[in-house]
Amino acid sequence: MANTFRIHMLKAKTGDSFIVECDNEAFFIDGGTRSVAKYLKRYLQENYLAKLQAVFVTHVDRDHIGGIAKLYGQFSEYVPKTAPIYMNHPDQVTITTNTSGLVTYEDGNSLKEVLMKNGYVLDEATTGKILDFNGVTVEVLSPPSVVAGQLFTEWRASDDGLVSTDLIEVDCSNVPPEPKNNISSDIVNASSIALTIRHAGKTALFLSDSLPEVVLNQIEGKIKFDIVKISHHGSKHNTSMELLRRIDCNNFIISTNGPRSYGHPHAETLARLILSSIEHGYSECNITFNYEKVCNRIKINNLPSGFHVNLIYSETITL
């Protein structure tokens, strides 16, 4: 099992949840919605050879933290206390562990209080932090501490649960206009933890729901990555050509079940991924989805001759 680098993409509905395996070391990145907790628990039960090294909670949106809150609130006996939890502002997440075993957000102690009371180690993750886990290197690209400090308690309304069946038509004839974001008006996503994981000569970039403007400030020149988890489920507002021109990569992950209310993934984002791969000199672009129905809804138009786009459905990627 030496030099293995594997990414498991859990079915987190509108959210994100990843298990990253580097040889016998395992890492959780986000926990999706509450329904994902049972999959995280099952992994800990069944993969006793894989040692959980750390848990990263990228930000406080429900579709990223729900499963983590439930995991620690209801199944904490399966989570080793040796694995630190990296999270900014855990005091803003409240959970209740009651006799019925249900976890809620509206009442109860903060997640920070629950974790500390049960002996877990909490730490912040801001720009510049570099962590080493038995040869696996994790580097935090964002958020800067000044942005993380601006985070206020603002939870997104829950999704309606309806999945779109509409065709996603991607036009590769022109570069879509760049997104225009206001960090102060989207501080929850602006404060998302973006990080890289390096192991066995491979590097993966996880962009969470980060804003391109924030990550751009931490990337100098062009950097090569073996795979990139695209920000905010493929939203057109969170991926820019300016950022992609600094990210030398043609292998991408998009985590979403394609909710009707958000329209993820957006055609503009897919076009940017394809066109940036062409600019970097690749002959193909690989985009992996964790829901097959989303993958099957995409139609690529006006693709340059000789260039190939591989739309892949998979729940596991091995680098």
Residues covered by each model-derived region:
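C-terminal regulatory/interaction regions
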Residues: 2-5, 213, 220-222, 246, ...
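Extended hydrophobic/aromatic segments used for targeting, binding, or gating
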Residues: 206-271
